A protein has these predicted regions:
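Alpha-helical linker/edge segments of TPR/alpha-solenoid repeat scaffolds
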Residues: 183-196
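Hydrophobic/aromatic-rich core segments of domains that either
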Residues: 44-105
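Hydrophobic/aromatic side-chain positions at a characteristic register within alpha-helices
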Residues: 151, 167-170
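Secondary-structure boundary elements
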Residues: 1-30
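TPR-adjacent "capping" and linker segments in tetratricopeptide-repeat scaffold/adaptor proteins
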Residues: 93, 99-106, 113-142
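TPR repeat positional signature
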Residues: 143, 176-179
Length: 196
């Protein structure tokens, strides 16, 4: 079996057996317990399998989304975990179009700090982030995503705790910025000083 065929089987079997129900802001624990996943947890599962089978790949973080680029026999392929059908993009023109949708003339453009990373339908017209991350940093993004849920529910202490965990795994401006904002809002909204 060639590498492309094996990759296709990995992608298909992962969706059949693990990635069962797309649910925005699902955790990796949710994925393992019930099959609920989002782009972060789905990409993490695929990344672990790609590691196991020796594929060369990179996880790409954008403002609202995470996906995987696989490098195979001199070509770049896309694994889009949120699309069980059509999510393995192999045609060079389709790969270029997919990547181009996240870039504006080669550079990303600005976004809101309290937006999540779990969407399937993403407006990419004003992206600012297009960054390669490793699996540890992806785990940090998982904590960030969970923190956004708490932030949007004005549960700032829980958001700050998750953002602190995220920063250990992935020190980034967006995580630090949301943590600072959560601390400020906890103080201004509830009069609680939660500096750590």
């Amino acid at each position: 079996m060639d590498s492309l065929s094996l990759l296709r089987i990995i992608f298909q079997k992962t969706h059949q057996r693990l990635l069962k129900d797309y649910t925005q802001h699902s955790s990796f624990s949710d994925l393992l317990e019930s099959g609920a996943y989002d782009c972060v947890s789905g990409s993490a599962a695929l990344g672990l399998l790609l590691d196991r089978y020796g594929y060369s790949y990179e996880v790409v973080e954008t403002d609202y989304h995470v996906f995987i680029q696989v490098y195979l026999e001199g070509k770049t392929l896309i694994l889009e975990s949120t699309l069980p059908v059509g999510g393995m993009i192999t045609a060079p023109s389709a790969v270029s179009g997919y990547l181009g949708a996240y870039l504006n003339e080669g550079k990303p453009v600005a976004r809101n700090i309290n937006e999540g990373l779990a969407g399937t339908k993403v407006d990419t017209s004003d992206n600012t982030i297009f960054r390669k991350v490793n699996l540890s940093e992806l785990a940090g993004l998982q904590h960030y995503n969970e923190a956004i849920v708490h932030f949007n529910q004005q549960e700032y202490r829980q958001a700050i705790d998750l953002l602190s965990k995220a920063l250990v795994l992935y020190p980034s401006e967006r995580i630090e910025g949301l943590k600072d904002l959560s601390i400020d809002l906890a103080y201004h909204t509830y009069g609680v000083d939660i500096r750590k």
